[in-house]
């Protein structure tokens, strides 16, 4: 029974659990890689070896965290668990395809790890730019394995996206409008549309790279009339929507958590929140070249991409101020998920402000490929996406398991993590402004102080990760069961108890529309 239940599952709750476990495991691999990076950079001089092995670690860290930690947890884990429950659907629209979406990920992960283990590894950075990723600078199978890994992860995400789009539009009760579904459902829907439109472009780009490497095509080789800049355009046309794919489900989670712990029955400005997410999704597709300000674009092109990028701050600001308005006048419960959510709002805003700085092409030409950029995107990912994951996990853990976490331990864990990530990434702004470049394993002594501080911060974050594992162990051994949940009238996912039965909404939900 156990083998068929977990290997052949078509149940959205089981598949969601598989995604969460897989994501947690990948997250530990990614954390280990990041600690290798910070160990190498903790003082001047070499630790691990040359820049090739260093860049292999950096590349693997990025791919593992993005494709095997954040996306599986936010979209696969929370999405599978919550979307059907929130819209009153018995399961996802295509339950067997759902199973395949998950089981494409472990082989994909295996291929990525294999790419590090053969030849010299793929030391290209997660962007995999040619000519560095070509068959001269990276002879051997490493980059090819990385490309195949991305193909599998991409197919997984595309199938998942089709599934979520069909489910959210087609499987809600007929009397319910799309504008009556919870914000997390909207967030996943917008995310799925972004995935569906952006991933095929990445697939095209890396497939052309594959043929350039192995079949003597010259898509990205000027010697045969190709252009390496074409690859950058294809990659970033995927890569920029991708960063919004990583954060949008987090926005949805934060909306739910903030409303719940502020004692509100709904978040402030529901329609504004929905349209802001759709605006972010649309704008995310027309700003990609802000990653390429240094490739020699025309000044008018740079002016457009600078302006368009800054426009994204408007819908993002709508969301931030709506969260603050949701808090306003609420009877705030200072429980751990609320702490994560408040941390998210503050730190995501800081990351957004450095993003506005980098949107200016004139400034970006100076700051491009420095640690200022690293600090910027780790503030929105390591303290945006990850804080949202933690807020959602601590909030919905009783729903997923029926057990409660120890609230004292989770609060301490939040405090340790908060100090750790800020100590790790805040000093990197200083390093970037002082001109320290990314993707080098060594640096002049002048940069030693802030690098050492940053590496100490990473060790504090490691302590937080270990604490989290202990907290999970404690919850499953203590087995404190959930007594009751408040606010179920406006939080449909809790309706069936903790944990919900294996099959929910087996007969269609009865929905009475309020006429006012």
Swiss-Prot record:
Residues exposed to the Mitochondrial matrix side: 1-11, 87-94, 171-182, 262-269, 328-335, 401-406, 479-516
Residues bound to O2: 244
EC number(s) from the headed UniProt entry: 7.1.1.9
Compartments, as annotated in UniProt: Mitochondrion inner membrane
Cofactor requirement: heme; Cu cation
Entry binding sites for Na(+): 40, 45, 441
Protein name (database record): Cytochrome c oxidase subunit 1
